[in-house]
Regions:
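Nucleic-acid nuclease catalytic cores
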Residues: 62, 80-105, 109-171
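Charged, glycine-rich intrinsically disordered N-terminal tails and low-complexity linkers that flank
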Residues: 1-75, 79
Length: 171
């Protein structure tokens, strides 16, 4: 059975004062429109700390995705204990006085021997991997930008690798 990982509380608490990878679609929408549509107001109010959302719901599909993610982490960690689950990766470059940018990649490996940082974003979905990549491209972009910054802060000779892990829930 998958071990329970206590990262959800940290992810929820970081919603105030920060935009994250899951806000990528919202940021792309704002950039594309050239203004902030009303559909983004609630998330931005949470980010600014002027609105608190108490009812974070979890659907059956979300719970299944978390379970699968934890099982994949268990497999990775059993092969290499350096794997981390959902660490907080906070940008220094894209932080200003009143808002920051961060991500919690599902799995992270910092390989000192090979000088490679690997981020893996895991998606449990009933879509194909191509559709999943297209649906989550904005989140992957933010994780890529933050991953490159994180890697450059470790050292110039280091390389960064972002992977999409896909589990099709249709069987």
């Amino acid at each position: 059975m998958a071990e329970e990982y206590n990262y959800k509380d940290e992810i929820l608490s970081s919603r105030v004062g920060f935009l994250g990878g899951s806000d990528g679609a919202m940021l792309a929408k704002i950039a594309g429109l050239g203004y902030v549509p009303t559909s983004c107001n609630e998330r931005l109010a949470i980010c600014k700390g002027i609105y608190t959302k108490e009812d974070y719901f979890v659907t059956e599909a979300m719970a299944l995705g978390d379970k699968i993610e934890n099982q994949i982490y268990d497999m990775l960690h059993s092969q290499d204990e350096r794997w981390q689950s959902n660490p907080r990766i906070e940008s220094k470059k894209y932080k200003c006085k009143n808002v920051g940018l961060l991500a919690h990649p599902d799995f992270v490996l910092v390989d000192e021997d090979k000088k490679i940082v690997t981020f893996i974003e895991c998606k449990a979905t009933n879509k194909t991997i191509k559709e999943a990549r297209r649906n989550y491209i904005n989140q992957l972009y933010i994780e890529s930008v933050l991953g490159k910054e994180y890697t450059n802060n470790i050292g110039k000779a280091w390389k960064f690798n972002l992977k999409l892990c896909h589990y099709n829930t249709d069987g």
